[in-house]
Amino acid sequence: MEIFDYDNVLLLPRKCRVRSRSECDTSVRLGERSFRIPVVPANMKTVVDEKICAWMAQNGYFYVMHRFDLDNVRFVRDMQARGCYASISLGVQPPDHDTVEQLAAQRITPEYITIDIAHGHADSVQEMINRIKTRLPRAFVIAGNVATPEAVIDLENWGADATKVGVGPGKVCITRLKTGFGTGGWQLSALKWCARVATRPIIADGGIRSHGDIAKSIRFGASMVMVGALLAGHEESPGQTVEEGSERFKEYYGSASPFNKGEYKHVEGRRILEPIKGPLAHTLVEMEQDLQSSISYAGGKKLMDIRKVNYVILGGDNAVLM
């Protein structure tokens, strides 16, 4: 098995088929909806809040609301009352099962439910998928996070409509340092490995450091990527604003950090400061334009044409052409 990550792979151009990059279609379908770009902000308290989620839904983007200190039933009701789709996160603890029962009792079905735990290849995830599929059968279920083909196969067999691949590669995640496990340093290889067996969409979660990494994720089998650091640090970001001299930053921390947990227990995340980048909308438009350029370099017109290109693995004098 080849081991590589985003920083030591480059994609190879093919003959361009468009006159303008603006002709290239970056949209992707997930469930019953299409979205402008294959990018979803990480479901973290310092990346998304209710206002950002509503704006994204109204402007053609996919979102997943975080699951911390939130009344999910009220959130779903409010989003759907606005004419927006509802996309929520759940864990696998008794309160999460209670939320499913409350939604079913009130005949409210969120369009998307993400089962979001650090080690998603677990009996508890199988139980939660089964509960959701039984009580809220119309919901599109995303389950994760996982790191192996075996896990993807199991989650699909258990009923997941999509899987989230990535254990610990994020900028504020320290899972590999604390536990010795994860996909940090080889996330792109893990994605390729998992995509070979997947029959449903994969969301690559973590390790994205530049817009070009989004195109690389699509090439190696992702339908969408979940991005934290690149979409934190905006004017609208819910993280606390910190000023140091003449510079302004936004607080950004992992869901398994003590800053999110409120206690130092089973910590696998840390806190950093992200320079404020300006409005979120500007970054999303730039991502779309950069993906259009990627599609044009791939010799295509649609997003998935990126999957047709060859690539090189960089390694000093020993670059490998694939």
Curated annotation (Swiss-Prot):
Gene3D superfamilies: Aldolase class I. The active site is at C173. GO terms for cellular component: cytosol; GMP reductase complex. Transmembrane segments: none annotated. Coiled coil: none annotated. It catalyses: IMP + NH4(+) + NADP(+) = GMP + NADPH + 2 H(+). NADP(+) binds at residues 202-225. Keywords: NADP, Oxidoreductase. GO terms for molecular function: GMP reductase activity. PROSITE patterns: IMP_DH_GMP_RED. Its EC number is 1.7.1.7. GO terms for biological process: purine nucleotide metabolic process. It is an enzyme of class 1 (oxidoreductase). InterPro entries: Aldolase_TIM, GMP_reductase, GuaC_type_2, IMP_DH/GMP_Rdtase_CS, IMP_DH_GMPRt. It holds the Pfam family IMPDH. HAMAP family: GMP_reduct_type2. Belongs to the IMPDH/GMPR family. GuaC type 2 subfamily. Catalyzes the irreversible NADPH-dependent deamination of GMP to IMP. It functions in the conversion of nucleobase, nucleoside and nucleotide derivatives of G to A nucleotides, and in maintaining the intracellular balance of A and G nucleotides. This is GMP reductase.
